[in-house]
Amino acid sequence: MDTSGHFHDSGVGDLDEDPKCPCPSSGDEQQQQQQPPPPPAPPAVPQQPPGPLLQPQPPQPQQQQSQQQQQQQSQQQQQQAPLHPLPQLAQLQSQLVHPGLLHSSPTAFRAPTSANSTAILHPSSRQGSQLNLNDHLLGHSPSSTATSGPGGGSRHRQASPLVHRRDSNPFTEIAMSSCKYSGGVMKPLSRLSASRRNLIEAEPEGQPLQLFSPSNPPEIIISSREDNHAHQTLLHHPNATHNHQHAGTTAGSTTFPKANKRKNQNIGYKLGHRRALFEKRKRLSDYALIFGMFGIVVMVIETELSWGLYSKDSMFSLALKCLISLSTVILLGLIIAYHTREVQLFVIDNGADDWRIAMTYERILYISLEMLVCAIHPIPGEYKFFWTARLAFSYTPSRAEADVDIILSIPMFLRLYLIARVMLLHSKLFTDASSRSIGALNKINFNTRFVMKTLMTICPGTVLLVFSISLWIIAAWTVRVCERYHDQQDVTSNFLGAMWLISITFLSIGYGDMVPHTYCGKGVCLLTGIMGAGCTALVVAVVARKLELTKAEKHVHNFMMDTQLTKRIKNAAANVLRETWLIYKHTKLLKKIDHAKVRKHQRKFLQAIHQLRGVKMEQRKLSDQANTLVDLSKMQNVMYDLITELNDRSEDLEKQIGSLESKLEHLTASFNSLPLLIADTLRQQQQQLLTAFVEARGISVAVGTSHAPPSDSPIGISSTSFPTPYTSSSSC
């Protein structure tokens, strides 16, 4: 808070404050000492604020003189002593808090709108409408009442601006809670509503606002524009304010809840952290493959150079082996870092609290085996052992002194498993979020096996070619290294001869002209034969798949065959009709029957019939074959359309039945109300009949007494004058 009373970094919003605050900044101290005390402010014009107002209690007229005296005394003390906000902590903390504010909720700070109110709440330009808690506290405290002017203006604001601790002020707590999601120390949020859900989760529901009692006043932190950075530091380190407070004051000791900071991490942070771990794991896998391949290449170079150019005890061999050892150490470190990232991903995905939950026996065994495989490499130095073998054709024993580096060099090719891991982590199926979501819905595990299957489906020829050539070269070099100590004739120890041996073993031919002598070479040839059998089967499957027609090609082929068969059926039917006509012609129309021509046309007639039957049979087979080509998805779509149509019809039928039911109910209600209508109609007609009868009787009596002769009716009315339902118009 600066001298104008505005919150700059608390994230709460801008609060209007009277510029006549008795706590100026350090740069305005001399001007405040020279200027005389300001006159009392005129009564403020009442405004209609956009938000609720806080109306303090107006001071009594008897207290105005004492208030002015206290104001003059405070101004004289400020002119005599150096104006700094820190020495006023004891005075500000000794002020009593209004007892109505204790154990109240945040909604209790709102007061009804009044024209005499001076603490007007207005919506802030940054964070919306916020509550000026300091004005409310000063307005309800005795000091604010004592400093109020006679006009009821803004004199109660002349107390020094204060900021409550985060635990005592709910709005400061909201701002501080929003800062931990925005990432700044006291950085205000541009969108406070974006973190409203997190703030609701962070604050306990139903907990009222707990203010400090007068015996234990809240810790007050005063800052100016120049002390903004120090104010931010004090807010995050509340214990540091004890060094600047008065000796007789005591501050409430409350700390920020560190447990909520971990629990209230939103899902966006977890997803971002998970994505970063994915990228780090992919980079670590790439670096591990690079250093693993580098070690293999240096090992091959050192083995070839030490066999033909220099010995194992030379400096060149020692330098190359040291380079291999260095690359191996780096590789082991990268593998450990890779598995560390995997454990972190497991913790994030499963919401575990402890990383030791992910360390199962299977994972520990897998990591140990991987470390053991990658740790094997030639040790710097010269180490020998005696190797005994039996020659192939002569069966004579052969004993030679070999290097230990052979045993440690050949297993280094096991590091090539890192290629499969890199292919998995760089695959679009593994990195794409949409494919992973669809795979998760279909319960598909995205592993190396799935990636290899997709590669074999997309480009089977390329995969088989690369795998076969790589296996051929590695197996040939391994056989050459294994056979070099026991091959006096330089047959299998030659690289070209070893490639010939591996090729005939890979293709399962086995001429027998070249055979390995050592168990090392025999084991390599055995593995090569097994892999060759598998690759041969894959080649046959790939070739058969390439030669097979696709569904579109099959549909086109069936359409063309059906067209040709239709033409053949027409031709066969025409031949049958032609031969039938010719037989009839030669037997019935001609005078002289030629039996040779008749037999000829009969023979052609039978051939045409058999041809027609054969073509029809081929057409039936083609139609059966075409029916088997109907896709399941197409059938499913057809069934879906039929079911949809049936559902629509059933809905229409239900609507019609509903309308019929409503009409039937209406008719039932009409029939039920019909007796009442008939009764009402009869009652009305009876009333009309009685009325007409009375009127007719009165008229007839009047006429009979004056002019008409007496009638034969006993009541004195003629039958013609008596209205009946059949003669009276009113009866209708």
From Swiss-Prot:
Residues 495-515 dip into the membrane without crossing it. Residues 562-638 are annotated as: Calmodulin-binding. Expressed at low levels in atrial and ventricular myocytes (at protein level). It catalyses: K(+)(in) = K(+)(out). It is a multi-pass membrane protein. Residues 643-670 form a coiled coil. Residues 35-61 have a biased composition (Pro residues). The keyword Nucleotide-binding does not apply. GO terms for molecular function: calmodulin binding; inward rectifier potassium channel activity; small conductance calcium-activated potassium channel activity. InterPro entries: CaM-bd_dom, CaM-bd_dom_sf, K_chnl_Ca-activ_SK, K_chnl_dom. Inhibited by bee venom neurotoxin apamin. GO terms for cellular component: cytoplasm; plasma membrane; Z disc. Residues 1-82, 119-161, 241-260, 704-732 are annotated as: Disordered. Residues 1-11 have a biased composition (Basic and acidic residues). It holds the Pfam family Ion_trans_2. Signal peptide: none annotated. The keyword Transmembrane applies. Keywords: Calmodulin-binding, Cell membrane, Coiled coil, Cytoplasm, Ion channel, Ion transport, Membrane, Phosphoprotein, Transmembrane, Transmembrane helix, Transport. Residues 119-133, 241-257 have a biased composition (Polar residues). The chain crosses the membrane at residues 289-309, 316-336, 367-387, 406-426, 455-475, 524-544. It is found in: Cell membrane; Cytoplasm, Myofibril, Sarcomere, Z line. Small conductance calcium-activated potassium channel that mediates the voltage-independent transmembrane transfer of potassium across the cell membrane through a constitutive interaction with calmodulin which binds the intracellular calcium allowing its opening. The current is characterized by a voltage-independent activation, an intracellular calcium concentration increase-dependent activation and a single-channel conductance of 10 picosiemens. Homodimer. Heteromultimer with KCNN2 or KCNN1; this modulates plasma membrane expression and consequently the small conductance calcium-activated potassium channel activity. The complex is composed of 4 channel subunits each of which binds to a calmodulin subunit which regulates the channel activity through calcium-binding. Interacts with CALM1. This is Small conductance calcium-activated potassium channel protein 3. The gene is Kcnn3.
